[in-house]
C-alpha cells in the first residue's frame, strides 16, 4: 500500500481543506494511506505588511512547491487563488475539485449591509481587488489593511476600529462558520471574485502517473474549464496580488464559458470590465485580456506596480 505525503500550510483553514480532500480520496476505497506534512510559507510568516508589498502571488506556495520538487511530499492542497499563473517545471495541477461559493463575504460589526454602512466607515481588507471595486461603489469609505488568518481577522473586527471586513465565502464555508458570521454575500456584479476563488488546486509532480490516476477521480470538469479561462486571462495580464485584477467564469446553459474580467486603479476611480463568451478556455481568457489591454489595462497595472514600490 502506497503512503502519499500531503503538504499543507499550518493554518486552520489550510488543514481543514487538506483533511477534507484526503477524506474524499479515502472514500474511494483504493489502496493508499495518507500523511499530512505541515509546511510554513513566507506568506504565513510576514504578517506586518500587505501581501502586495511582499511579492504577491506565490507567497503561500513556494516552499510547498520546493517540497514537491525535492520529493519530501507527493501532493499539496492549495486554494486556487493563491496559485501563480505559471507553475515550476515538473509540477502540474493534478486535479480541480468542484468549486464552492466564489463570492466575497461582507461581515459588519453591527449587522449593517454594505449599502447601509455609515459614510466614512472603515473597511478592512488586504486585497487590492476588493478595495478597488468596493471604493468604486462607495468612494466615501475608508480602506484599512488587515492581515492574518480568518480567526485573527474576525477578532480584529470585534476589537479594533473596523466597521466591516471582507473575506472569501469559501473559506468561511469550509470552516463551517458561514451562517454565523456573514452579514451578506457580495454579488459578483458588485465585486468580481479573484481568479480561482472558491476552488482548490491539487498540485503534484507531472511524472507521478500513479497519483495522477488517483486524482482524476476527484476532478470536476466544469471547475477545470472555468478556472482555466480565468488563469489564462491572469497569465496574459501578468497580474498578481500587486494589482486590482479579477476574473470569474461560469458555464452557460449551452456549455459555453462566460468570463467576466476586470482590472482597476488602486483607488477604484477607474474600473475596466469585459465579459467574453466562448467554448475554448484559452481563447476566452486571451480575448478578455486583449479587450482590457485595448482599454488601457497595462497602464493601470504599471501604475499599480509603481504604487507598491
From Swiss-Prot:
This protein's source sits in the domain of life called Bacteria
Q: Name one GO biological process term.
A: protoporphyrinogen IX biosynthetic process
Q: Does the keyword Transferase apply?
A: yes
Q: Which reaction does it catalyse?
A: 4 porphobilinogen + H2O = hydroxymethylbilane + 4 NH4(+)
Question: Entry's Pfam families?
Answer: Porphobil_deam, Porphobil_deamC
Please tell me whether the keyword Transferase is annotated for this protein: yes
**Manner of cofactor binding, per the entry note:** Binds 1 dipyrromethane group covalently.
Among InterPro entries, the record links this protein to: HemC (IPR000860), Porphobilin_deaminase_cofac_BS (IPR022419), Porphobilin_deaminase_N (IPR022417), Porphobilinogen_deaminase_C (IPR022418), Porphobilinogen_deaminase_C_sf (IPR036803)
Its pathway is: Porphyrin-containing compound metabolism; protoporphyrin-IX biosynthesis; coproporphyrinogen-III from 5-aminolevulinate: step 2/4
Keyword entries, A-Z: Porphyrin biosynthesis, Transferase
Which cofactor does the UniProt annotation name? Answer: dipyrromethane
Report the coiled-coil segments. Answer: none
Q: From the Swiss-Prot or TrEMBL record, what is one GO molecular function term?
A: hydroxymethylbilane synthase activity
GO CC term (a single one): cytoplasm
Sequence positions bearing S-(dipyrrolylmethanemethyl)cysteine = 241
Q: What is its EC number?
A: 2.5.1.61
Its family?
A: Belongs to the HMBS family.
Q: Which NCBIfam families match?
A: hemC (TIGR00212)
What is this protein's function per UniProt? Tetrapolymerization of the monopyrrole PBG into the hydroxymethylbilane pre-uroporphyrinogen in several discrete steps.
Miscellaneous notes: The porphobilinogen subunits are added to the dipyrromethane group.
Describe the protein's quaternary organization and the partners it interacts with.
Monomer.
Name of the protein this chain belongs to: Porphobilinogen deaminase
